[in-house]
Regions:
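Helix-loop interface residues and adjacent transmembrane-helix termini in multi-pass membrane transporters
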Residues: 11, 22-25, 139-140, 167-169
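Alpha-helical transmembrane segments of multi-pass membrane transporters/permeases
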Residues: 79, 136-162, 173, 177-180
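Interfacial/gating helices of multi-pass transporter permease domains
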Residues: 19-39, 107-112, 172-173
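Short alpha-helical transmembrane segments in multi-pass integral membrane proteins
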Residues: 56-123, 167-201
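Small-residue-rich hydrophobic transmembrane alpha-helices
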Residues: 28-88, 127-146
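Hydrophobic faces of transmembrane alpha-helices in multi-pass small-molecule transporters and flippases
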Residues: 2-7, 117, 121, 144-151, ...
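Hydrophobic transmembrane alpha-helices of multi-pass small-molecule transporters
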Residues: 40-43, 157-158, 187-191
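N-terminal transmembrane alpha-helices
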Residues: 1-18, 22-23, 39-51, 83-87, ...
């Protein structure tokens, strides 16, 4: 499940690149460029979340449920704060970041990349929360929950892409919006599951 989940995590951008091809080469190139940034951020957030979840796992191993709940809440807070900071930096430095990483690129490719980067950057806080929740579930050996949530995220993304591209003809903005919506929903699902009383990861109130 863990390997499959990791594949699903990075497949969102791949699907976006594939489905936006109808909008032209510039759209494909722009989305593909930003997808490189997104994949790097996903790996960083996943690694940080996994490290934080180890603490919660240790408390669970020692049967200290209260501290495990507290550490889970702290991890969610830290990840949401960090990813929100990344969002702000990405929104403010949109053009500068693209220019710095990729150098001089064609105007139409740059515009597509900027649009996709701007909209998907809004999803970073939700991506951070999802990664935190997924890591916490994996830490107690319940990787199926995070895998299934990731699968749902991908299904929503594919359906959203189809709707926004083929029905509303939104191009790059459409695939970015579908990605944003899918990550919001996945974060809501993972937090909801964590809050259910039958898990040991109920968020502290």
């Amino acid at each position: 499940p863990l390997i499959f989940e990791q594949l699903l995590a990075v497949s969102v951008g791949f699907v976006d690149t594939f489905m936006v091809s109808i909008a032209g080469e510039a759209a494909v190139s722009g989305v593909a460029l930003v997808d490189n940034i997104s994949n790097l951020l996903i790996q960083i957030l996943s690694a940080l979340a996994t490290g934080g979840a180890v603490v919660c796992s240790q408390y669970l191993g020692s049967r200290n449920i209260n501290m495990s709940k507290k550490s889970a809440g702290q991890l969610i807070f830290i990840m949401s704060t960090l990813s929100s900071l990344l969002m702000v930096i990405s929104l403010i430095g949109n053009h500068g970041i693209i220019n710095f990483i990729f150098g001089k690129i064609e105007k139409d490719v740059f515009e597509s990349a900027s649009i996709y980067f701007y909209i998907t950057a809004i999803s970073y806080p939700f991506l951070g929360v999802y990664n935190a929740g997924a890591a916490l579930f994996r830490s107690i050996g319940n990787s199926k929950i995070s895998m299934n949530t990731s699968l749902i995220m991908n299904i929503i993304n594919i359906c959203g892409n189809a709707l926004f591209i083929f029905v509303f003809d939104m191009g790059v903005a459409g695939v970015a919006l579908a990605t944003l919506i899918s990550r919001i929903i996945s974060a809501i699902i993972i937090i909801g599951l964590m809050s259910v009383s039958y898990t040991h990861l109920t968020l502290p109130t």
